[in-house]
């Protein structure tokens, strides 16, 4: 069981022994995190652990997690104004049914990560207000039965077509009770 904390990093807990196996924090010698404030975690279909912190996104390689030297990978591709995703305040990580990853930030919009099957690298698209999103403060990410991605923000609900990355915004005039959503407050 992976346990995320608000100020104490992320801990792997063993049910059988009822003890913590390892805790990763900013001061860890082997695998320091960019921040001890963990906002969200996701275990994907390949057993990788995605850790969204207040200062960036890291991924713990699931295949090598229990060896003597686990591997954290920082995402560091360039975005706008020389900022990097690994410095963003990550608030939600979502794996789509097809294995793509959607990463929501507190004030920098949304990142769509798609694995390139030939290189195994992650390609990304940055979706923000300039690309049609209602607001850059992401509150929640969900996927419907038609594979549309629904993104709740501070200023409305957005439906994204993952094929074209086109965005349709829903707000008060579309029947919403409020334009501002709570963080990760949804049921599927």
Residue ranges and their predicted role:
Residues 1-188:
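Carboxylate-rich, polar loop motifs that coordinate divalent cations or form catalytic acidic clusters
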């Amino acid at each position: 069981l992976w346990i995320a904390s608000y100020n104490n990093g992320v801990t792997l807990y063993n049910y059988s022994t009822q003890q913590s196996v390892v805790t990763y924090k900013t001061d860890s010698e082997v695998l320091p995190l960019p921040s001890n404030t963990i906002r969200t975690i996701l275990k994907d279909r390949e057993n990788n652990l995605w850790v969204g912190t207040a200062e960036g996104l890291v991924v713990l390689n699931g295949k090598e997690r229990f060896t003597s030297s686990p591997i954290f990978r920082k995402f560091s591709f360039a975005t706008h104004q020389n900022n990097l995703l690994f410095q963003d305040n990550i608030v939600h990580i979502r794996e789509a049914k097809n294995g793509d990853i959607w990463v929501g930030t507190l004030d920098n919009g949304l990142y769509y990560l798609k694995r390139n099957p030939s290189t195994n690298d992650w390609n990304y698209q940055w979706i923000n207000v300039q690309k049609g999103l209602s607001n850059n403060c992401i509150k929640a990410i969900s996927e419907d039965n038609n594979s549309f991605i629904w993104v709740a923000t501070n200023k409305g609900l957005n439906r994204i077509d993952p094929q074209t990355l086109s965005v349709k915004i829903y707000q008060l005039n579309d029947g919403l009770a409020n334009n501002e959503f709570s963080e990760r407050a949804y049921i599927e």
